[in-house]
Amino acid sequence: MMLIYQHIDVYAARPVTLRTLMTRLALTLSLFSCVATASAAATATSPIVLHAAHLLEIASGHTLSPGEVLIDGETITAVGTSVPHPAGATVIDLGGATLLPGLIDVHVHLFLHPGAAEDLQTVEESVPQRTLSAILAARADVLAGFTAERDMGTEGAGSADTAVRNAIDQGLFLGPRLRISGNAIDILGGHEDANRFNPDEHLLSNADRANDSGELVATIREQRKEGADFVKIYETGKDAFRDGKLASPYQYTAAQLAAAVAEAARVGGTVAVHAQGEPGTLYAAEAGVASIDHATQLSDATMKIMKEKNIPAVPTFTVFEHFAAEPGPKAARERQILDYKIAEFKKQLAAGIPFAVGSDVGPFPHGTQARELELMVEYGMKPLAVLQADLLNGARLMGMSGQIGELKPGYYADIIAVPASPLDDITAVERVSFVMKGGVVVKGPSAN
């Protein structure tokens, strides 16, 4: 018996009350109760054959026409224009669609939602309420075709993302494969500290505090104990845009970041940094971080190191586009920042640095972040290069190279179908009609 999760849009773009969240979660739980028996059977299902008009090979850029994938359990066993159809196999014909691997977003915030300022969400909403919201956000993301994500900090919810990841892994809730960081790490008075609030209220930072190398190592150990897969560090402070440039102070030296990278590596993890401007981005590159997120205003020296060490930049255009489109007095300034980021991105493309795809979704609605791929193409990157950045570099940042990001035998059967080739129309990735994660259909037609 094959498990099919039907798509219900339960994640809205407006602020949500705890009562509304509970109602939506109850609906989600009722769906799962209806298919609980099927869930147990899904791991022992008969082989599945997916058939579509086209299949995109990501590494080579070649398109197979038609395309077929044979799935046994949670993994792919064969890919080609024609694959074996074992006796008793379930065949799903997706017609004129194009098959490609499930998308990867390496910069998401499951614990943020649209409609309220981030700092107010973290103060006014309890961690249990935010965790319920995160479960719904994860569901919206996977139904949009994102089968793997890196959650870049709970913004004050501590290690609550550990529970979300574990619940998804255990099949209790629908969501992507997650790599989580718990809270990000920040200095006293840094990017995520409660700087604009009454100091007599003693509000906590939205990040874990570490002021030197020793505190960084201790914090990383504590986060690892609580279930974190990787480390997120704020390397630059609040981003001030003056005279057409960013003026963002660095928060850690290269030596301090190197200590963090070494400690993360000791236990099999990596460090990703929020960083814009110099010398913060240079310090991050010198320390050998896994990725530099936002990554605006990179010097030639920084880009040279990023190329040498294969450190991807993660532009996060979509969240900046969102801020630029919001009504209010800040919109014009946000548009200037976005225009500046676009110009800087073109310089980075010319320099040949690697990229990965991360949207910073959370301030804008979960499930809409495929827009990031479209924007990267619009701003000058070739469609195949964007898909390779998303899937190949994304898999590497997830620590899952050789497991996800391509349709190959032995890889997890994380597969989506879109109505046209994204090589011809990158916006096709915003119209996902079919999603399979680990051999289980979570969106789209059932077996014929």
Residue ranges and their predicted role:
Residues 122, 266, 335-421:
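His/Asp/Glu-enriched, well-ordered alpha-helical/loop segment
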Residues 163, 213-235, 239-313, 335-354:
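Histidine/acidic residue-rich metal-binding segments in metalloenzymes
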Residues 24-37:
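Bacterial N-terminal signal peptides
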Residues 114-115, 161, 190, 241-244, ...:
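Histidine/acidic-residue-rich catalytic or RNA/ligand-binding cores of hydrolases
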Residues 120-132, 198-217:
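Active-site mouth loops of central-metabolism enzymes
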Residues 46-48, 55, 60-100:
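Histidine-rich, glycine-flanked metal-binding segment
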Residues 97-172, 188, 255, 287:
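Metal-associated gating/positioning segment near the N- to mid-region
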Residues 133-159, 174-183, 228-239, 270, ...:
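Divalent metal-dependent hydrolysis catalytic cores, especially in the metallo-beta-lactamase
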